[in-house]
Every structure is written in structure tokens, then in C-alpha cells.
């Protein structure tokens, strides 16, 4: 397997951000004010996590965009590179991590509207988890995210 290169993925996503949003979020795309450049907040996002826990097999992009009505929104792109999808433990870890990104961004920037997309590169078409669920004595939480 070729060596994973975080910077290549980040540059690719930055360069292709607009067509990626058009493809993955066709309803959101025309609402974005593209005359204003998206602000990429990877460094701020990385600071929300313990560096020892951040792996080298995924890339996280947090972009702040403005809609045509002037409101600010956030788009979280998570690229999962190879190796996942082999078992139930991987799935639960991945789903929980997606939820953790969501609630930390929501808490840090005090925002409700976050569009999240997980891009999986593992090649296993049957492994496409799209939600994190937990329940304890009648209290239930379900977080659903986009996956490609």
C-alpha cells in the first residue's frame, strides 16, 4: 500500500472543494456565496483533540462558508484512508469519532448547522456506516451523517 500523505489529501480537497460540495451536497451548493472564499480551519479542528489519539489514516477538513443570506455555516469533511471496515469494533470507533467531531465543532464555534461527510476509501462497498447511536435506559441519541 502506498504511504499515506496527509498534505496531498488536504491540498486535493482544498483545490477540489467547490466541485466536491456540488457533487456531495447538491442542495447546499447553490445556497453558498462562492464570491467569499471558504475558510479552512483544520488547525483549529486538530487542536480540539488529543494529538496522541489522532491517527495517520484520516484527514479532517473543517470549512467555514457563508450562504447567500449572509449566515455562516460549517462543513466537516472526514476522509478515512484504508484499513477500516474490517470488523464491528472499527465501525463503532469510526461512528463515534464522527459524532465526536460534530459535537466538538458545535461546542467550540457555538453552531448548530454542520454538514458532515465521511469519504471512505477502503473499497468495501458493504461498509458504509452513516450513523452513531447510543441508548441508555430510555435516553437515546442518534447522529446521522453523509457517507461516500
How should each PLM-predicted stretch be described?
Residues 1-148:
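Accessory alpha/beta interaction modules
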